[in-house]
Amino acid sequence: MSVMITILNGPNLNFLGQREPKIYGTETLEDIEKNCREWAKRADVIINFYQSNYEGQLVEWIQEAIGLSSGLIINPAAYSHTSVALLDALKMFSGPKVEVHLSHIYRREAFRHHSYTSIGVDAIISGCGSDGYRFALEYIAKQLINCKR
């Protein structure tokens, strides 16, 4: 199954490993990317892995993934609580989509309990740390296999 999955990471995730390790863990975004690429290689999946602190760039990457990628994973970080633009872009992507959060957003401050972007995805994985990315990859791969049956 050679398919492409786009993985997008939002603001401040480039500081993983340094930023609030009690909440986000000690792994860096580079560690997470390496683990995703290792999983993808075993599963014969191609991944595009991106990070931006800019909402418009994330929107553009979602738009680029339309027609190019079979699935999409997004950790919108703080934009999940504010971005209708990301929600609208996610709604345009027709393949399986998963929102990932390293921390358990419902055990944090009340303003983090609402996610606009979650309306535009098929599943949310929250509170599993970096394993959430692997769970999302496995979910999307399974959805794509089931679609081919």
Swiss-Prot record:
Active site: Y24 (proton acceptor), H101 (proton donor)
GO biological process: amino acid biosynthetic process; aromatic amino acid family biosynthetic process; chorismate biosynthetic process; quinate catabolic process
Superkingdom assignment: Bacteria
Alphabetically ordered keywords of this record: Amino-acid biosynthesis, Aromatic amino acid biosynthesis, Lyase
Binding-site list for substrate: N75, H81, D88, L102, S103, R112
Pathway(s) of this molecule: Metabolic intermediate biosynthesis; chorismate biosynthesis; chorismate from D-erythrose 4-phosphate and phosphoenolpyruvate: step 3/7
Family of the protein in this entry: Belongs to the type-II 3-dehydroquinase family.
Name of the protein in its database record: 3-dehydroquinate dehydratase
Record organism: Bartonella tribocorum (strain CIP 105476 / IBS 506)
Gene name tied to this protein: aroQ
